[in-house]
Amino acid sequence: MSWRQVILLSSLSALVLLCMLQEGTSASVGSRQAAGEEVQEGMKQKIFMQESDASNFLKRRGKRSPKSRDEVTAENRQKLRDDELRREYYEEQRNEFENFVEEQRDEQEERTREAVEQWRQWHYDGLYPSYLYNRQNI
């Protein structure tokens, strides 16, 4: 077989295969469209409720009628959860600030101690023992 015959045969087989696949997909689209419409109807039924159910849903409890026990407990649980989260947040903020203040205070004390030590070394005349040994006990 020459290379021309091989190319002609392969292109012809590819053309036949594409034609068959195109007919198969066009036949399946029609059934999928019908199935898609059925699915959309099902979705509408899930999303939208009947008019009578909707009016009953809105009229279930008026503004001035007392809340049910379940509603009250759910609201109380939500409030308690919010209070706990708020308490934890402020406690964490307070701890971070206290740690920051403690670090700042320690750094300031260290700088002050070093400055006092340098002053004592500079002004020490050598006649007396150093300040540490010259403390007056009261």
Swiss-Prot record:
Chain residue ranges for the region called Disordered: 58-85
Signal peptide: 1-27
Propeptide stretch(es), residue numbers: 28-64
Protein location: Secreted, Extracellular space, Extracellular matrix
Tissue localization of expression: Detected in immature, proliferating, mature, columnar and hypertrophic chondrocytes from ribs, tail, vertebra and femur.
Basic and acidic residues composition-biased segments: 67-85
Coiled coil feature spans: 78-122
Highest rank taxon of the organism: Eukaryota
Xref: Pfam families: UCMA
InterPro entries: UCMA
GO BP term, example: osteoblast differentiation
Coarse class of the protein's main subcellular location: secreted
Family membership noted in the UniProt record: Belongs to the UCMA family.
Protein's job: May be involved in the negative control of osteogenic differentiation of osteochondrogenic precursor cells in peripheral zones of fetal cartilage and at the cartilage-bone interface.
Protein's name according to its UniProt entry: Unique cartilage matrix-associated protein
